[in-house]
Amino acid sequence: GFRVKECHSDGEFECIRAALADDKAYLNVTSEDEHDPVIDRYIRTVKERTRSTYNSVPFKKIPTMMVIEMVHASNYWLNSFPANDGVSATQSPRQIVTGQLCDFKMHCMLQFGEYVQVHESHDNSMKSRTTGAIALRPTGNNQGGMYFMSLKTGERINRYAWTQLPMPSEVIDQVHQLACHNPA
């Protein structure tokens, strides 16, 4: 295990000061308009990764939920590999905190924004057994599940089975339609 000794934050986290003190951890809260270089650098890195992802997808407009998931994906991947200046040269922040490793065959199968048909639970009816979706990010579970945006509903769904397909222009148009109803 590990023990948190110090936490850097802004005023929003003042409410956890007592809980941290009970665990003998120090909460360093910055003043209004004050900056913490470590926090600022991490925020800048997440923004750069998110901007890079945003500019790599074929969509001109994307729904708010996709932007939020893009930020989560950037954070997920930053925590999935050891940082050059991190506390461990061999263990990722995710592994240190949760004990979970990043498995290439499970967690690195799709990139953000790829088109897939996710496999739905089915019965003996004539209903479709797949749904069009856009890959968002791994769930991080041990089964290799992924979060997707359903092209039918625009909602985030969690699936572990899918078929990767080329991106037709109709899918790009559908994402643009979803973005018009819920703009970023």
Task: Give, region by region, the residue ranges found by the protein language model.
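Nucleic-acid-interacting cores, centered on viral/eukaryotic replication and modification enzymes
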Residues: 1-184
